[in-house]
């Protein structure tokens, strides 16, 4: 007897759990790079997020009268939690990641029926809710720890997240008192803030002299471009393993690069297109978030259109909006368009007459 089950169904012999584990593995280079440059807060936020996500998913599935272990074993909720944890500031208060994870799991996934039913990327739902609700906590980034006179230890990181103070009683601001205050933002934040008050090309050289951009005098936006390169390497690995398709990340990056390059010819406005590609969450979003098989387009042409749309939205938000990054908003806005994209890009069924022919 065959047992009939509802969608989503697994194809190509790849179990969902195996795919999720491959994606998590591909994120590890960026994960450890982020720890190297920004400290143990990344590790603690990830542990908090994964623990909260598992508990929330367990309760939600239990309330629906199903067996939680059958769903938790696919590791999808762990991946969602890890993506969210790596997207927020490493030393944000503990309640930020807990609230964000609950929103991601419950409002972004379970409210629609679970894995395969959600129209929006759950991690980005949680991230956007946090960004809108707690802008101060979500935009206060510690500079790379090698710029600090006293980098926080594991105990300091734990204490900062849960009490706001290190074990010696210092706040995050006090730890960075010897560095220009603008370094508590990301390079994209710094560039946008600086540009609003300086619009001359000569002023740009003053911007890149700031510690967050030059550090020891050789690194551009140190920490950030290394993390983006690590995400790029992990993304290429997933493409080679056929876990994700190349169309979405390539279309997204090429679209953004072309628009950013064209803008550069109109006059000095922002960082170069290359600098934009290795700053913020560009590579993270292109290879690990936009490629979510549940919320992205499923047709070959649709993937290209979807990726290009994400790249367009990122460009519009970064260059003409108030948010310096915009990857999360771009992906959610593009998720809205997926049903329409898939409808008009469905491959013609063999033997089915084309439009206008009988």
UniProtKB/Swiss-Prot annotation:
Residue list for modification FMN phosphoryl threonine: 186
Signal peptide start and end residues: none
Enzyme class, first EC level, given as a word: translocase
Enzyme Commission code(s) on record: 7.-.-.-
Similarity section: Belongs to the NqrB/RnfD family.
Name of the protein in its database record: Ion-translocating oxidoreductase complex subunit D
GO BP terms, alphabetized: electron transport chain; transmembrane transport
Superkingdom of the source species: Bacteria
Organism of origin: Haemophilus influenzae (strain PittEE)
Subcellular location(s) of the protein: Cell inner membrane
Functional summary from the UniProt entry: Part of a membrane-bound complex that couples electron transfer with translocation of ions across the membrane.
GO cellular component: plasma membrane
UniProt keywords, alphabetically: Cell inner membrane, Cell membrane, Electron transport, Flavoprotein, FMN, Membrane, Phosphoprotein, Translocase, Transmembrane, Transmembrane helix, Transport
Matching PANTHER family: ELECTRON TRANSPORT COMPLEX PROTEIN RNFD, ION-TRANSLOCATING OXIDOREDUCTASE COMPLEX SUBUNIT D
Cofactor(s) listed: FMN
Cystine residue pairs: none
């Amino acid at each position: 007897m065959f047992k009939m089950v509802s969608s989503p169904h697994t194809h190509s012999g790849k179990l969902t759990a195996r795919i999720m584990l491959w994606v998590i593995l591909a994120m590890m280079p960026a994960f450890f790079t982020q720890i190297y440059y920004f400290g143990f807060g990344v590790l603690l936020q990830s542990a908090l997020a994964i623990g909260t996500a598992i508990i929330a998913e367990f309760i939600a599935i239990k309330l629906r009268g199903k067996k939680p272990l059958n769903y938790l074993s696919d590791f999808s909720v762990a991946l969602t939690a890890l993506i969210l944890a790596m997207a927020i500031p490493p030393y944000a208060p503990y309640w930020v990641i807990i609230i964000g994870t609950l929103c991601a799991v419950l409002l972004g996934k379970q409210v629609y029926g679970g894995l395969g039913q959600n129209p929006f990327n759950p991690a980005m739902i949680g991230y956007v809710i946090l960004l809108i609700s707690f802008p101060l906590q979500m935009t206060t980034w510690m500079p790379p720890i090698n710029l600090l006179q006293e980098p926080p230890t594991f105990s300091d990181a734990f204490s900062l997240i849960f009490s706001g103070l290190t074990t010696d009683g210092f706040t995050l601001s006090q730890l960075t008192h010897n560095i220009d205050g603008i370094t508590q933002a990301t390079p994209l934040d710094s560039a946008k803030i600086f540009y609003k008050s300086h619009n001359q090309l000569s002023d740009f050289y003053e911007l890149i002299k700031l510690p967050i951009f030059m550090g020891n005098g050789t690194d551009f936006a140190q920490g950030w471009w290394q993390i983006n390169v690590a995400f790029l390497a992990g993304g290429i690995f997933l493409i080679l393993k056929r876990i994700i398709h190349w169309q979405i990340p390539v279309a997204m990056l090429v679209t953004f690069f072309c628009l950013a390059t064209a803008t550069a010819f109109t006059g000095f406005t922002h960082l170069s297109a290359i600098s934009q590609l290795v700053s913020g969450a560009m590579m993270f979003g292109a290879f690990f978030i936009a490629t979510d098989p549940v919320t992205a387009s499923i047709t070959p042409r649709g993937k290209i259109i979807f990726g290009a749309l994400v790249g367009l939205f990122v460009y519009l938000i970064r260059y003409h909006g108030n948010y310096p990054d915009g990857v999360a908003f771009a992906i959610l806005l593009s998720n809205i368009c997926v049903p329409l994209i898939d409808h008009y890009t469905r491959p013609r069924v063999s033997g089915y007459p084309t439009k206008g022919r009988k």
